[in-house]
Amino acid sequence: MADTTTLLHTTVLLDEAVDALLGGAGPAPAGVWIDATFGRGGHSRRILERLGPDGRLVAFDKDPEAIHEAARITDARFSIRHEGFRHLADLPERSAAGILMDLGVSSPQIDSPERGFSFRFDGPLDMRMDTTRGESVADWLATADVGQIAEVIREYGEERFAGPIAKAIAARRAERGPLRTTSELAQLVAGAVKTREAGQNPATRTFQALRIFINAELEELQAALEASLRVLAPGGRLAVISFHSLEDRIVKQFIAQHSREVYDRRAPFAAPQPMRLKALDRIKPGACEVDANPRARSAVMRVAERTEVPA
């Protein structure tokens, strides 16, 4: 396990997210608050600073290193579950005063060669958020066919050279055996991508695609968003920070879908299903934060409030 004290993580939109979640800059109202993606605990610690004695904070994370970091928090108001945030659905109905989701990969995950998330470091081609279960990227690439590989890279990486990359992976597998390290994959992708985007490593989209796929990130996000509707109490807030267009599109469409009345075309005279969310805000990091933490550049936070009308 990596030493999380040496791999620093700067929390993106720290105060903005907590203020949006709590409905202002003052003390948190009493209730149960959810940090659905604990990471290295930046948001959780800030929420606890604002939480009254009767408040509670429940966090989720499937990364064993995040659970290790959470053990350093001795506050009795805090608890964490070693599971993905799709398990929000296990919480009691209308029990949460607010839910925060900070999507994507933390700096310690990216900067740990043994986790295999980054083409910048040579390490095992793993990319699992939860290293205690599931198959690694290397294991999947060792058996997937060309069509499957191309589909994943195209869908989750929006990579126009997905076909050539998939063929190169299959050819390498047939000639020399499966890919096992991040450097091997990065070099292979660089040879298959014929044109380069300025300022971007040619392997960026492929690594993103494989990470999203192997962790079922978009499916988990959709499940967690759906669960939030049931778990949020009326007036409770949902704040979601995303880092790429695929995530943000899902969040944007989800909020839009539930921020309007829905009519049943099969029953034109029936009362419409009431709106269940009210869109509140869209916030991006300011120039100062981006200068201090370039990884914040792509972040966008969307905030919505659960309406008073029962679902």
From Swiss-Prot:
It catalyses: cytidine(1402) in 16S rRNA + S-adenosyl-L-methionine = N(4)-methylcytidine(1402) in 16S rRNA + S-adenosyl-L-homocysteine + H(+). Its EC number is 2.1.1.199. It is an enzyme of class 2 (transferase). Pfam families: Methyltransf_5. GO terms for biological process: rRNA base methylation. Keywords: Cytoplasm, Methyltransferase, rRNA processing, S-adenosyl-L-methionine, Transferase. This is Ribosomal RNA small subunit methyltransferase H. It comes from Paracidovorax citrulli (strain AAC00-1). The gene is rsmH.
